[in-house]
Curated annotation (Swiss-Prot):
It comes from Dehalococcoides mccartyi (strain ATCC BAA-2266 / KCTC 15142 / 195) (Dehalococcoides ethenogenes (strain 195)). GO terms for molecular function: nucleotide binding. This is Nucleotide-binding protein DET1318. Keywords: Nucleotide-binding. Transmembrane segments: none annotated. It comes from the Bacteria.
Amino acid sequence: MPSLDVVSVVDMQAMDNAVNNAKRDLGNRYDFKNAKYELVLNRKDKKIEIVAEDEFKLKAIIETLIQQCVRFKLDSKCLDVADAHTVSLGAAKTEIKIKDGLTKETASKITKFIKSTKLKLDSAIQGEQIRITGKQIDDLQEIMQLLNGQDFDVPLQYVNMKR
């Protein structure tokens, strides 16, 4: 029986490249000359910490980071931007969490959606992935299209497609 796995994985090397390119782009911008800012990727905790002189610069850093993520084919849905808060002397700070893996809530939403499509498919949650099996490969391809059309707040990838 044909099957495939639905996962949500972020390539941390591509994220590291996006952060480094964002730093390089910000260094070349005129409005960031002599500006103090920090953009740090913490691979272990899967988060990005940003500190800037003010909220305007903080928003510009976030926009530049998102542009670089798109350039490296990382979906911006994997970034969970927290609200900015003020630290000493008017500097603004925020933390961006990188969503990696499917949570139980998201996985259950996806399986409910699959069941609601009335396609002859079985889905099972296996840790941080969902295994979908069906009698025809066409049904699997159709569910891939339908899942891409939905918004589950995480980027979805399809792996291990077997005939």
